[in-house]
Amino acid sequence: MNATVKCTLLIILGVEIIIGCLGNGFIAVVNIMDWAKRRKISLVDQIFTALAISRLAFVWSLLTVLFTSELYSALMTTRKVLIIFNNSWTVINHFNIWLATCLSIFYFLMIANFSNSIFLSLRWRVKTVVSVTLLMSLLLLFVNVLVINTFIVISVDVYKVNTSYSSHSDNNIHISRIFLFTNTIFTFIPFSVTLTIFLLLIFSLWTHLKNMQHNAKDSRDPSTTAHIKALQMMVTFLLLYTIFFLALVMQSSKMKFLSSTVFNYFFEVISLAFPSGHSCVLILGNSKLRQTFISTVWWLKSSFNAAELPGP
């Protein structure tokens, strides 16, 4: 039974890796080619490109850790390897999460309708707001890495004192839980920001529709359409984000059955669903990416049909 479940999870994992690489690679290539052609790039395209690159790195880092832990499990007990892997994953995951949060902030400032002077000031300085948010997040990244490295050093030193097999296994589980628990705490901050933005967008849409009804105007104006489109993307993003966050919470818990190999693969599948699935949402939600994707599909279809035609 476990072998069947494990095989199924590996197939799903493989599909997610392919989707993640193709989807995020597509976003990065399209925006970089457009940048090279126009000699300029908009703020939202900058965020899209950086997010796509960070998610490509996330997919490959997760794949590297998975293969290393399966094939060279002894390496995962050394301090140097643990620090390299954990720090790499922490940094990549940090930018993956915070760039997505910055994208939410950008959409909120550009779409929401509030007459508050502070909000209007932030809207006019949206590029500065995004830049400052990323810079401030680096402080959290520094603290996150510092805490994780401290726990790794302490845990490895304890393991060296007691080198029995059971202590080796327990120590690996302990390090993993500390690592995941720490990342869960630091992931909760951008998650809270994104959730707040989502609620504010709903409130903005509600007040906008209320004003439209009061003025007896058509509710299907450009602002309403933009609100609904942004909320649709945010709902999907929040759903994937919530699943990813809950997976971190469960992995960092002390329930022993969650330490089994099958559950480890299950959590890997959940972790990859966020960067892989959200890339598809971004492509479908962005007009330039969507049109380029459709054109690419039609070109590939035409090329395939032409190749199948028999020669004279």
Swiss-Prot record:
GO cellular component, one term: membrane
Side of membrane Extracellular, spans: 1-9, 68-90, 155-184, 251-264
Cytoplasmic side of membrane: 31-46, 112-133, 206-229, 286-312
Domain of life (superkingdom): Eukaryota
Subcellular location: Membrane
Family annotation (SUPFAM superfamilies): Family A G protein-coupled receptor-like
Function: Receptor that may play a role in the perception of bitterness and is gustducin-linked. May play a role in sensing the chemical composition of the gastrointestinal content. The activity of this receptor may stimulate alpha gustducin, mediate PLC-beta-2 activation and lead to the gating of TRPM5.
Stated name of the protein: Taste receptor type 2 member 140
The entry's keywords: G-protein coupled receptor, Glycoprotein, Membrane, Receptor, Sensory transduction, Taste, Transducer, Transmembrane, Transmembrane helix
Glycosylation sites: N2, N86, N162
Pfam hit, one: TAS2R
Keyword Membrane found: yes
Other notes: Most taste cells may be activated by a limited number of bitter compounds; individual taste cells can discriminate among bitter stimuli.
GO process terms (BP): detection of chemical stimulus involved in sensory perception of bitter taste
InterPro entries: TAS2R
Coiled coil: none
Membrane topology: Multi-pass membrane protein
Organs and tissues of expression: Expressed in subsets of taste receptor cells of the tongue and palate epithelium and exclusively in gustducin-positive cells. Expressed in 15% taste bud cells in circumvallate and foliate papillae but only in 2% in fungiform papillae.
GO MF assignments: bitter taste receptor activity; G protein-coupled receptor activity; taste receptor activity
Family: Belongs to the G-protein coupled receptor T2R family.
Transmembrane segments: 10-30, 47-67, 91-111, 134-154, 185-205, 230-250, 265-285
Disulfide bond residue pairs: none
